[in-house]
Amino acid sequence: MSEFPKQAQVVIIGGGVGGASIAYHLTLLGWKDVVILEKHELTSGSTWHSAGLVGQLRSRANITQLLGYSVDLYKRLEAETGQATGWKMNGGLRLACNPERWNEVRRQATTAKSFGLEMHLLSPTEAQELWPLMTVDDV
């Protein structure tokens, strides 16, 4: 932009993931007069320091669905915008070191399945075959 606008329909303070997401979604809805105010570069604050982890399964359905939407958005964002996002779906690992935790992980697997999320229950030996550096003596 060559000149700073004198007015805007929407002014978003902060160009982190929250502000950028609000601007993105407003423009998808057809809003044309949206400005982000950021004191440095976009996503250079707390967003830049984040690990970028997006675990999808949560205890509340609405949050799980929102995170699923986020993953779908991140998957298509690079093709849609032409901007490299660096998005990679690597998965995660939940460990159970006692019977109570194992029961909890099994319940989570059932919940994940109900949301259409992929989750596999592995024995300690199977986990170690996938991650050889992992010590499984107490898993």
Question: What annotation goes with each model-predicted range?
Answer:
Residues 26-27, 112:
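Hydrophobic alpha-helical packing residues
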Residues 27-48:
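Glycine-rich FAD pyrophosphate-binding loop
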